[in-house]
């Protein structure tokens, strides 16, 4: 649902899993985990999902943890890769600027500055949840913890339905070591990665890690001078300093930087074949993997190419001080910022009907203090406070060729050329012919019951703009204060009870500014005129036919508003208007856990999650009108979960499971109205399901795992009653193994895996035609085709290591059977009857070389 916000302001348990953990404490050699004689990493697992160190079996909710070694074994470089192996976790990545991250069917990927996330992403406890800045490379990672269910009590804002915490590898002071890695593959894929850990002294350690990767696009560009689509170009670096002046005080300073400059996203129309915009010759077919003829409109954003330019950086300071044997003080201080600009061909055709740009700027500061109590007695607890300050700005710009947009509205992109299929856009010279445009204007007017006179039709046709530009700027400033606490009471050696509470206060300001950038829209004014009563309709139509009407300033002599197409301007063509809101709310949890032995845990937990009130801003309904501010009620969810975690056969067999039920009130969603997407309260919703995983490590040579998740997520009221949540497959499954054997002087290993997900819809309306008819949409959507049926992907790696893994070579393949699938459908063009589809990744393969020292 990429940049759907571009039109959003327009006026026109049986028990199942929490996935067995694969985490471990700091490795004993460079990047290698400690193992026992069976190859089992779980002997040393430590997680901090409950803000204190525990074994995963002790955590009373569904928790998935993966070690850095697991990420390496399965070549997991980003969240989309990770999601395929994690039950109940889904990631749709159109570009690093537009991920949709979902836990148990709940997601949000809106780019509005004022939107609040439902799933929170953390780096070492620092929230990085704004979608435009959340997608980061996973490299030199100690572990990733995925906590499912409402985690507002533990993690605070944004963790309505879960949290993902990336624990980055920290410097070690006991050794100096490093790693270098290189990969190359098809599609001209190259990756370079390195890590260096320096033990400067027994109390000071330094660590630097970085990754750079590049790959050609996966969808061919059919127009000269335009790069193939969906390419990869990412560079990321991290530097960290650890100081331990004593065993009671640890200080970490971490700096992160990432830059992404991929080519444009392949928003491909399946209604219109790609054609040469000059000759009209058909260049390829309608398949999502077929080539695309996309290009930005002339002069848009200073002539920038399609693609993304994104920078993300941050500085984090961590302090852990043992004040006494019972009290430990933790501090997390962080500053983070990101800036993005993405240029998009929204319409998905070879004609520059609509070109879009989204620019996002964000900066945030956060401070958390937490005091933990643990005197080895029956009670453990913590209390804390946090402050969060964020400033965000989203700029959405669009450029229309009004002549081509008119042809689409009139269902005449084929130019009415005799014998030319409706699927083949005509040459630009045909569609820009004033005579044809005049006829199309009369046809559109006729559909409104209005007889457009020939002279007025000719005059308006002559005034249609090839490059009408307008923009929306929405800003949000947030100050939030949190107080929180949690306590666990061990009633007996086998039974413990716990509860937590968090209070949050938000102080928000939302502002909006809309403007037309090069005069009024003639097409927008014409469509607006058709909805007016007489005599105003004819008066406005006649004025729009005056030569040069697009650029004549409004005056007493020419009282024609500055019309936009999607963004009607605020006062004085761009005044910034703001509104304020203050919000308070509580979240809580309560749980019980029974542990008959150290390797078995049964638990039940109830939790309340809360997404803060949203103060949304829509542009005026008419030029120079008042912006439309809407306060959307806080969304709440009540979660009930029971689960079991156990290790059998001397910790060789792990079985985990969870059953859950969620009940939502004031579910926030986006609803399409014409060319407008508005934030609405969809009312009630619910989901229930289960997750289950098994892991078996019979020997040092063989490790197997499998997991399955079922999630039934549905709306329960309003026009969406009965619809599935978007990006919420009912069934997901993954399985894999690692087989290794000593061969000659080294060790050979083979790691195949298969992942499966069932059918998903890409919008909450499930692309149901009855929900997409005028006036809800500008043009009717007659087909339910914006979904992806179930599919499976197979990957494999074959490697050989020498000298205990110091030197390693491997070959790999992803999507081994070249399965065709789509990762998104609909998108911004859907609002104008131009849905687009984005192809998933094809088969890729290559070789990797690694050296450790």
Residue locations for each model-derived region?
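Membrane-embedded beta-barrel scaffold of Gram-negative outer-membrane proteins
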Residues: 318-322, 328-344, 595-619, 631-688, ...
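C-terminal beta-signal and adjacent terminal beta-strands/loops
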Residues: 43, 392, 398-405, 755-773, ...
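N-terminal Sec signal peptide and the immediately downstream disordered periplasmic leader
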Residues: 1-74, 80-85, 247-248, 315, ...
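Solvent-exposed loop segments that connect transmembrane elements
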Residues: 218-230, 265-301, 346-355, 397-471, ...
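Periplasmic-side early beta-strands and strand-to-turn transitions of outer-membrane beta-barrels
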Residues: 174-175, 181-183, 190, 195-289, ...
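Gram-negative outer-membrane beta-barrel transporters
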Residues: 382, 386, 493-497, 652-664, ...
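Outer-membrane beta-barrel translocator/receptor signature
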Residues: 116-118, 130, 139-148, 153-223, ...
């Amino acid at each position: 649902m990429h940049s759907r916000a571009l039109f959003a302001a327009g006026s026109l348990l049986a028990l199942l899993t929490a996935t067995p953990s694969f985490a471990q404490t700091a490795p004993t050699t460079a990047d290698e985990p400690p193992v026992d004689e069976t190859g089992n990493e779980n002997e040393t697992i430590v997680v901090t999902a409950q803000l204190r160190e525990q074994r995963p079996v002790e955590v009373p909710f569904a928790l998935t943890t993966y070690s850095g070694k697991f990420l390496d074994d399965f070549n997991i470089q980003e969240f989309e890769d990770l999601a395929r192996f994690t039950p109940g976790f889904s990631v749709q990545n159109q570009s690093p600027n537009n991920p949709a991250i979902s836990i148990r069917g709940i997601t949000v990927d809106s780019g509005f500055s004022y939107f609040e996330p439902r799933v929170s992403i953390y780096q070492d406890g620092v929230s990085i949840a704004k979608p435009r800045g959340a997608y980061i490379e996973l490299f030199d990672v100690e572990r990733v913890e995925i906590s499912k269910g409402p985690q507002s009590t533990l993690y605070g804002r944004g963790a309505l339905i879960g949290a993902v915490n990336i624990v980055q590898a920290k410097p070690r002071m006991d050794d100096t070591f490093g790693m270098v890695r290189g990969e190359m593959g098809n599609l001209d894929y190259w990756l370079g990665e390195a890590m260096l850990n320096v033990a400067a002294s027994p109390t000071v350690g330094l660590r630097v890690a970085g990754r750079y990767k590049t790959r050609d696009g996966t969808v061919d560009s059919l127009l000269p001078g335009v790069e193939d689509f969906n390419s990869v170009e990412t560079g990321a670096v991290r530097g960290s300093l650890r100081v331990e002046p004593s065993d009671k005080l640890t200080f970490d300073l971490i700096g992160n930087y990432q830059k992404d400059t991929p080519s444009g996203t392949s928003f491909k129309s399946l209604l219109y074949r790609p054609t040469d915009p000059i000759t009209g010759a058909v260049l390829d077919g309608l398949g999502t993997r077929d080539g695309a003829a996309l290009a930005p409109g002339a002069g848009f954003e200073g002539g920038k190419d399609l693609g993304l330019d994104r920078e993300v950086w941050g500085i984090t300071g961590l302090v852990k001080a043992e004040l006494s044997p019972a009290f430990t003080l933790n501090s997390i201080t962080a500053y983070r910022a990101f800036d993005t600009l993405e240029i998009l061909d929204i319409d998905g055709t070879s004609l520059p009907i609509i070109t879009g740009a989204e620019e996002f700027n964000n900066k945030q500061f956060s401070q958390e203090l937490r005091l933990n109590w643990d005197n080895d007695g029956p009670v453990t607890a913590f209390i804390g406070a946090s402050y969060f300050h964020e400033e965000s700005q989203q700029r959405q710009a669009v450029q229309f060729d009004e002549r081509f947009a008119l042809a689409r509205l009139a269902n005449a992109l084929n130019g009415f050329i005799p014998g030319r299929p409706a699927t083949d856009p005509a040459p630009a010279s045909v569609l820009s012919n004033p005579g044809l445009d005049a006829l199309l204007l009369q046809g559109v007017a006729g559909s409104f019951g209005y007889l457009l006179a020939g002279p007025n039709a000719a005059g308006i046709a002559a005034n249609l703009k090839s490059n009408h530009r307008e923009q929306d700027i929405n800003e949000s400033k947030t100050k939030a204060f949190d107080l929180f606490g949690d306590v666990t009471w061990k009633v007996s050696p086998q039974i413990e009870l716990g509860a937590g509470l968090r209070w949050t206060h938000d102080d928000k300001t939302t502002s909006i500014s809309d403007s037309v950038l090069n005069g009024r829209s003639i097409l927008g004014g014409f469509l607006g005129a058709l909805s007016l009563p007489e005599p105003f309709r004819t008066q406005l139509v006649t004025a729009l036919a005056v030569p040069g009407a697009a650029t004549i300033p409004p005056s007493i002599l020419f009282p024609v508003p500055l019309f936009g197409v999607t963004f009607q301007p605020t006062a004085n063509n761009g005044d910034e208007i703001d509104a304020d809101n203050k919000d308070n709310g509580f979240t809580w949890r309560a749980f019980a856990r029974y542990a008959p032995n150290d390797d078995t845990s049964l638990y039940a937990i109830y939790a309340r999650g809360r997404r803060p009130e949203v103060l949304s801003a829509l542009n005026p309904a008419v030029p120079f009108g008042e912006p439309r501010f809407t306060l959307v009620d806080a969304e709440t969810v009540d979660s009930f979960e029971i689960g079991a975690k156990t290790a059998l056969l001397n910790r060789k067999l792990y079985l985990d499971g969870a059953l859950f039920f969620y009940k939502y009130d004031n579910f926030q969603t986006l609803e399409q109205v014409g060319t407008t997407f508005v934030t609405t309260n969809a009312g009630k919703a619910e989901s229930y399901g289960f997750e289950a995983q098994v892991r078996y490590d019979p020997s040092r040579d063989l490790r197997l795992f499998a997991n399955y998740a079922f999630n039934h997520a549905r709306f329960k009221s309003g026009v969406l009653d009965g619809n599935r949540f978007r990006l919420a497959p009912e069934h997901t499954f993954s399985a894999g193994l690692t087989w290794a054997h000593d061969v000659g002087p080294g060790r050979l290993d083979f790691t195949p895996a298969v992942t499966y997900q069932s059918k998903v819809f890409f919008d909450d309306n499930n692309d149901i035609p009855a929900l997409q008819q005028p006036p809800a949409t500008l043009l009717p959507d007659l087909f339910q085709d914006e979904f992806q049926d179930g599919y499976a992907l197979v990957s494999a790696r074959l490697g050989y290591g020498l000298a205990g893994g110091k030197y390693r070579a491997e070959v790999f393949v992803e999507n081994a059977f070249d399965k065709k699938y789509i990762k998104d459908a609909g998108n911004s063009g859907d609002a104008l009857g131009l849905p687009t589809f984005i192809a998933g990744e094809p088969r890729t393969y290559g070789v990797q070389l690694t050296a450790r020292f």
